[in-house]
Amino acid sequence: MASHIGKLPVTIPAGVEVKIDGQSFTAKGAKGTDSYEIPEGITAVVEGNEVVLTPADDLRPTRAKHGLARSIVAGMVKGVHEGYAKTLEIVGTGYRAQMKGKGIEFSLGYSHTITVEPPAGIEFELPNPNQVIVKGIDKQAVGQCAANIRKLRAPEPYKGKGIKYADEHILRKAGKAGK
């Protein structure tokens, strides 16, 4: 019994160059270069325009790593080809963001402003003061950076004020009942 995800081949799109050196996997594309150390017990082979990952045995931990490695490789190939982006929306009166160099300065109702510098490989975009786009080639880094920004002022359930993902729905609570 093999991993359902792991047994699927990863298609390499045109313009993406893949190199496998032992357990080291490198993908190079229009957006940049990314590399990953494939776990022990998993071998990767390029067959035509696909990357196929195969487990050395059928033990449960190896099957789990097989699916994980395949997902990470697929994410890397997509990242260097198209890139990843997460959009955050800032909701609330007086809550806004503005570019400050490469970083962003947030006004979120605190007594001070908060400045966030982008980590390596990540860039910010501000289409308007109430919207932040986090872009990069590493899916995990983009998601983590977006989560760190959201954490600065997570949406509250009564008025929905705070920083939320563009596709996120905030569950609302009824306020206290008046007399």
Swiss-Prot record:
Keywords: Ribonucleoprotein, Ribosomal protein, RNA-binding, rRNA-binding. GO terms for biological process: cytoplasmic translation. PROSITE patterns: RIBOSOMAL_L6_1. One of its GO terms (cellular component) is cytosolic large ribosomal subunit. GO terms for molecular function: rRNA binding; structural constituent of ribosome. Signal peptide: none annotated. InterPro entries: Ribosomal_uL6-like, Ribosomal_uL6-like_a/b-dom_sf, Ribosomal_uL6_a/b-dom, Ribosomal_uL6_bac-type, Ribosomal_uL6_CS. Pfam families: Ribosomal_L6 (PF00347). It comes from the Bacteria. Part of the 50S ribosomal subunit. Belongs to the universal ribosomal protein uL6 family. This protein binds to the 23S rRNA, and is important in its secondary structure. It is located near the subunit interface in the base of the L7/L12 stalk, and near the tRNA binding site of the peptidyltransferase center. NCBIfam families: L6_bact. This is Large ribosomal subunit protein uL6. It comes from Bifidobacterium adolescentis (strain ATCC 15703 / DSM 20083 / NCTC 11814 / E194a). The lineage of its organism: Bacteria, Bacillati, Actinomycetota, Actinomycetes, Bifidobacteriales.
